[in-house]
Amino acid sequence: MIDKTAVIHPSSIVEEGAVIGAGVHIGPFCFVGSQVEIGAGTELKSHVVVNGITKIGCDNQIYQFASIGEANQDLKYAGEPTRVEIGDRNRIRESVSIHRGTVQGGGLSKVGSDNLLMINAHIAHDCIIGDRCILANNATLGGHVEIDDFAIIGGMTAIHQFCVIGAHVMVGGCSGVAQDVPPFVIAQGNHATPFGINIEGLKRRGFDKESLHAIRNAYKLLYRSGRTLDEVKPEIAELADQHPAVQAFIDFFARSTRGIIR
Protein backbone atom coordinates (compact mmCIF):
# COMPACT_ATOMS: atom_id res chain seq x y z
CA MET A 1 0.00 0.00 0.00
CA ILE A 2 1.38 3.39 -1.01
CA ASP A 3 -0.05 6.49 0.65
CA LYS A 4 -1.39 8.98 -1.86
CA THR A 5 0.88 11.71 -0.48
CA ALA A 6 4.07 9.70 -1.04
CA VAL A 7 6.35 10.84 -3.86
CA ILE A 8 8.21 8.13 -5.78
CA HIS A 9 10.59 8.95 -8.61
CA PRO A 10 9.66 7.09 -11.81
CA SER A 11 13.12 5.48 -12.02
CA SER A 12 12.65 3.75 -8.64
CA ILE A 13 11.15 0.30 -8.09
CA VAL A 14 8.71 -0.27 -5.23
CA GLU A 15 7.52 -3.86 -5.24
CA GLU A 16 3.87 -4.72 -4.73
CA GLY A 17 3.16 -5.34 -1.05
CA ALA A 18 5.47 -2.63 0.30
CA VAL A 19 3.84 -0.21 2.75
CA ILE A 20 4.82 3.40 2.09
CA GLY A 21 3.58 6.00 4.59
CA ALA A 22 2.34 9.56 4.25
CA GLY A 23 4.79 12.09 2.89
CA VAL A 24 7.50 9.55 2.13
CA HIS A 25 9.87 10.69 -0.61
CA ILE A 26 11.70 8.07 -2.66
CA GLY A 27 14.29 9.63 -4.96
CA PRO A 28 15.83 8.31 -8.18
CA PHE A 29 17.01 4.74 -8.72
CA CYS A 30 15.92 3.26 -5.38
CA PHE A 31 14.66 -0.28 -4.77
CA VAL A 32 12.10 -1.11 -2.07
CA GLY A 33 11.19 -4.76 -1.57
CA SER A 34 7.73 -6.25 -1.15
CA GLN A 35 8.07 -6.85 2.61
CA VAL A 36 9.30 -3.37 3.49
CA GLU A 37 7.38 -0.83 5.58
CA ILE A 38 8.48 2.82 5.53
CA GLY A 39 6.95 5.30 8.00
CA ALA A 40 5.64 8.78 7.36
CA GLY A 41 8.04 11.52 6.36
CA THR A 42 11.03 9.30 5.66
CA GLU A 43 13.18 10.21 2.65
CA LEU A 44 15.31 7.92 0.49
CA LYS A 45 17.63 10.32 -1.35
CA SER A 46 18.67 8.18 -4.34
CA HIS A 47 20.18 4.76 -5.15
CA VAL A 48 18.98 3.32 -1.82
CA VAL A 49 18.14 -0.38 -1.45
CA VAL A 50 15.71 -1.50 1.26
CA ASN A 51 14.94 -5.20 1.11
CA GLY A 52 13.80 -8.17 3.19
CA ILE A 53 11.43 -7.94 6.15
CA THR A 54 12.36 -4.39 7.07
CA LYS A 55 10.41 -1.81 9.05
CA ILE A 56 11.61 1.80 8.99
CA GLY A 57 9.96 4.41 11.19
CA CYS A 58 9.14 8.06 10.57
CA ASP A 59 11.18 11.07 9.45
CA ASN A 60 14.39 9.22 8.66
CA GLN A 61 16.87 10.57 6.11
CA ILE A 62 18.58 7.80 4.13
CA TYR A 63 21.33 8.79 1.72
CA GLN A 64 22.80 7.44 -1.50
CA PHE A 65 23.86 3.81 -1.79
CA ALA A 66 22.70 2.81 1.69
CA SER A 67 21.71 -0.87 1.84
CA ILE A 68 19.21 -1.95 4.49
CA GLY A 69 17.76 -5.39 5.13
CA GLU A 70 19.85 -7.49 2.78
CA ALA A 71 21.03 -11.00 3.67
CA ASN A 72 23.70 -11.08 6.36
CA GLN A 73 27.23 -12.42 6.00
CA ASP A 74 27.00 -15.16 8.64
CA LEU A 75 28.02 -18.43 6.99
CA LYS A 76 25.24 -20.24 8.88
CA TYR A 77 22.55 -18.06 7.33
CA ALA A 78 20.29 -20.10 5.03
CA GLY A 79 17.80 -17.49 3.92
CA GLU A 80 15.49 -17.62 6.95
CA PRO A 81 12.91 -14.79 7.19
CA THR A 82 14.77 -12.59 9.66
CA ARG A 83 14.26 -8.86 10.11
CA VAL A 84 15.55 -5.31 10.42
CA GLU A 85 13.79 -2.61 12.45
CA ILE A 86 14.74 1.07 12.43
CA GLY A 87 13.15 3.77 14.59
CA ASP A 88 12.49 7.44 13.88
CA ARG A 89 14.54 10.51 12.91
CA ASN A 90 17.74 8.69 12.06
CA ARG A 91 20.28 10.05 9.60
CA ILE A 92 21.71 7.15 7.62
CA ARG A 93 24.48 8.49 5.42
CA GLU A 94 26.03 7.30 2.19
CA SER A 95 26.89 3.61 1.76
CA VAL A 96 25.77 2.53 5.23
CA SER A 97 24.89 -1.19 5.38
CA ILE A 98 22.48 -2.74 7.89
CA HIS A 99 22.04 -6.50 7.57
CA ARG A 100 19.11 -8.61 8.69
CA GLY A 101 19.41 -10.86 11.75
CA THR A 102 19.98 -14.59 12.11
CA VAL A 103 17.76 -17.25 13.66
CA GLN A 104 20.53 -18.09 16.13
CA GLY A 105 20.74 -14.45 17.24
CA GLY A 106 17.04 -13.80 17.71
CA GLY A 107 16.26 -12.92 14.12
CA LEU A 108 16.41 -9.13 14.46
CA SER A 109 18.87 -6.34 13.76
CA LYS A 110 17.58 -3.15 15.37
CA VAL A 111 18.43 0.54 15.26
CA GLY A 112 16.61 2.91 17.64
CA SER A 113 15.82 6.58 17.06
CA ASP A 114 17.74 9.84 16.61
CA ASN A 115 20.99 8.17 15.59
CA LEU A 116 23.62 9.38 13.14
CA LEU A 117 25.20 6.62 11.08
CA MET A 118 27.99 8.25 9.08
CA ILE A 119 29.37 7.27 5.69
CA ASN A 120 30.17 3.57 5.17
CA ALA A 121 29.27 2.44 8.70
CA HIS A 122 28.39 -1.27 8.86
CA ILE A 123 25.86 -2.83 11.24
CA ALA A 124 26.03 -6.61 11.06
CA HIS A 125 23.42 -9.24 11.84
CA ASP A 126 21.64 -9.19 15.21
CA CYS A 127 23.14 -5.87 16.33
CA ILE A 128 21.04 -3.75 18.66
CA ILE A 129 21.66 0.02 18.54
CA GLY A 130 19.96 2.27 21.09
CA ASP A 131 18.94 5.92 20.73
CA ARG A 132 21.03 9.04 20.02
CA CYS A 133 24.17 7.12 19.10
CA ILE A 134 26.80 8.18 16.58
CA LEU A 135 28.74 5.76 14.40
CA ALA A 136 31.40 7.76 12.58
CA ASN A 137 32.72 7.05 9.07
CA ASN A 138 33.67 3.42 8.44
CA ALA A 139 32.77 2.23 11.95
CA THR A 140 32.23 -1.53 11.75
CA LEU A 141 30.15 -3.67 14.10
CA GLY A 142 30.47 -7.45 14.14
CA GLY A 143 27.42 -9.62 14.65
CA HIS A 144 25.39 -9.45 17.88
CA VAL A 145 27.01 -6.20 19.07
CA GLU A 146 24.93 -4.01 21.39
CA ILE A 147 25.41 -0.24 21.49
CA ASP A 148 23.57 1.54 24.32
CA ASP A 149 22.06 5.04 24.23
CA PHE A 150 24.27 8.09 23.59
CA ALA A 151 27.36 6.04 22.70
CA ILE A 152 29.80 7.43 20.13
CA ILE A 153 31.93 5.10 18.01
CA GLY A 154 34.87 6.77 16.27
CA GLY A 155 35.76 6.47 12.61
CA MET A 156 37.54 3.34 11.35
CA THR A 157 36.77 1.54 14.62
CA ALA A 158 35.93 -2.18 14.61
CA ILE A 159 33.93 -3.88 17.36
CA HIS A 160 34.17 -7.63 17.87
CA GLN A 161 31.13 -9.90 17.73
CA PHE A 162 28.98 -10.04 20.90
CA CYS A 163 30.59 -6.98 22.51
CA VAL A 164 28.44 -4.58 24.52
CA ILE A 165 29.16 -0.85 24.46
CA GLY A 166 27.60 0.94 27.44
CA ALA A 167 25.57 4.13 27.50
CA HIS A 168 27.46 7.43 27.08
CA VAL A 169 30.66 5.63 26.03
CA MET A 170 33.06 7.29 23.62
CA VAL A 171 35.32 5.00 21.59
CA GLY A 172 38.12 6.84 19.81
CA GLY A 173 38.84 6.47 16.12
CA CYS A 174 40.85 3.61 14.61
CA SER A 175 40.25 1.44 17.68
CA GLY A 176 39.72 -2.30 17.93
CA VAL A 177 37.27 -3.30 20.65
CA ALA A 178 37.38 -6.95 21.69
CA GLN A 179 35.68 -6.76 25.11
CA ASP A 180 32.75 -4.92 26.66
CA VAL A 181 33.08 -1.21 27.44
CA PRO A 182 31.29 -0.11 30.65
CA PRO A 183 29.00 2.93 30.61
CA PHE A 184 30.46 6.45 30.71
CA VAL A 185 33.98 5.29 29.77
CA ILE A 186 36.31 6.70 27.10
CA ALA A 187 38.09 3.86 25.26
CA GLN A 188 40.85 4.05 22.68
CA GLY A 189 43.39 1.80 20.97
CA ASN A 190 43.81 -1.70 19.56
CA HIS A 191 42.97 -3.48 21.72
CA ALA A 192 40.92 -0.69 23.28
CA THR A 193 41.77 0.31 26.85
CA PRO A 194 40.04 2.77 29.23
CA PHE A 195 41.07 6.43 29.32
CA GLY A 196 38.77 7.88 31.96
CA ILE A 197 35.16 9.06 32.07
CA ASN A 198 33.36 10.92 29.26
CA ILE A 199 32.84 13.92 31.53
CA GLU A 200 32.11 16.51 28.84
CA GLY A 201 29.48 14.30 27.25
CA LEU A 202 27.80 13.69 30.60
CA LYS A 203 27.77 17.41 31.41
CA ARG A 204 26.06 18.13 28.08
CA ARG A 205 23.42 15.56 28.94
CA GLY A 206 22.59 17.13 32.28
CA PHE A 207 24.41 14.97 34.84
CA ASP A 208 24.85 16.95 38.06
CA LYS A 209 28.14 17.36 39.96
CA GLU A 210 27.21 14.82 42.61
CA SER A 211 26.45 12.15 40.02
CA LEU A 212 29.65 12.91 38.12
CA HIS A 213 31.68 12.59 41.32
CA ALA A 214 30.06 9.24 42.11
CA ILE A 215 30.69 7.96 38.57
CA ARG A 216 34.35 8.99 38.88
CA ASN A 217 34.62 7.10 42.16
CA ALA A 218 33.12 3.99 40.60
CA TYR A 219 35.62 4.27 37.75
CA LYS A 220 38.51 4.55 40.20
CA LEU A 221 37.36 1.43 42.01
CA LEU A 222 37.04 -0.42 38.73
CA TYR A 223 40.29 0.63 37.09
CA ARG A 224 42.66 2.16 39.63
CA SER A 225 42.27 0.08 42.77
CA GLY A 226 44.35 -2.83 41.50
CA ARG A 227 41.56 -5.26 42.36
CA THR A 228 39.45 -7.62 40.28
CA LEU A 229 35.93 -6.86 39.11
CA ASP A 230 34.46 -9.35 41.57
CA GLU A 231 36.35 -7.69 44.41
CA VAL A 232 35.09 -4.17 43.65
CA LYS A 233 31.50 -5.01 42.69
CA PRO A 234 30.18 -4.80 46.29
CA GLU A 235 31.68 -1.33 46.78
CA ILE A 236 30.30 -0.10 43.47
CA ALA A 237 26.91 -1.51 44.47
CA GLU A 238 27.09 0.48 47.72
CA LEU A 239 27.82 3.62 45.70
CA ALA A 240 24.83 2.84 43.50
CA ASP A 241 22.57 2.67 46.57
CA GLN A 242 23.49 6.29 47.32
CA HIS A 243 23.82 7.58 43.74
CA PRO A 244 21.37 6.15 41.16
CA ALA A 245 23.61 7.07 38.20
CA VAL A 246 26.14 4.45 39.34
CA GLN A 247 23.52 1.70 38.99
CA ALA A 248 24.33 1.70 35.27
CA PHE A 249 27.65 0.00 36.12
CA ILE A 250 25.94 -2.75 38.12
CA ASP A 251 23.36 -3.39 35.41
CA PHE A 252 26.11 -3.50 32.80
CA PHE A 253 28.21 -6.03 34.70
CA ALA A 254 25.20 -8.37 34.75
CA ARG A 255 24.97 -8.20 30.94
CA SER A 256 28.64 -8.59 30.15
CA THR A 257 29.68 -11.91 28.63
CA ARG A 258 33.08 -11.09 27.10
CA GLY A 259 34.60 -9.40 30.14
CA ILE A 260 35.31 -5.69 30.33
CA ILE A 261 38.18 -3.76 28.80
CA ARG A 262 41.22 -3.26 31.00
UniProtKB/Swiss-Prot annotation:
GO cellular component, one term: cytoplasm
Signal peptide (from-to): none
Pathway note: Glycolipid biosynthesis; lipid IV(A) biosynthesis; lipid IV(A) from (3R)-3-hydroxytetradecanoyl-[acyl-carrier-protein] and UDP-N-acetyl-alpha-D-glucosamine: step 1/6
Pfam families the record matches: Acetyltransf_11, Hexapep
EC id: 2.3.1.129
Keywords: Acyltransferase, Cytoplasm, Lipid A biosynthesis, Lipid biosynthesis, Lipid metabolism, Repeat, Transferase
Catalytic activity: a (3R)-hydroxyacyl-[ACP] + UDP-N-acetyl-alpha-D-glucosamine = a UDP-3-O-[(3R)-3-hydroxyacyl]-N-acetyl-alpha-D-glucosamine + holo-[ACP]
UniProt record, GO biological process: lipid A biosynthetic process
MF GO annotations: acyl-[acyl-carrier-protein]-UDP-N-acetylglucosamine O-acyltransferase activity
SUPFAM superfamilies: Trimeric LpxA-like enzymes (SSF51161)
NCBIfam families, alphabetized: lipid_A_lpxA, PRK05289.1
Summary of the function given for this chain in its UniProt record: Involved in the biosynthesis of lipid A, a phosphorylated glycolipid that anchors the lipopolysaccharide to the outer membrane of the cell.
UniProt protein name: Acyl-[acyl-carrier-protein]--UDP-N-acetylglucosamine O-acyltransferase
Originating organism: Yersinia enterocolitica
Annotated gene: lpxA
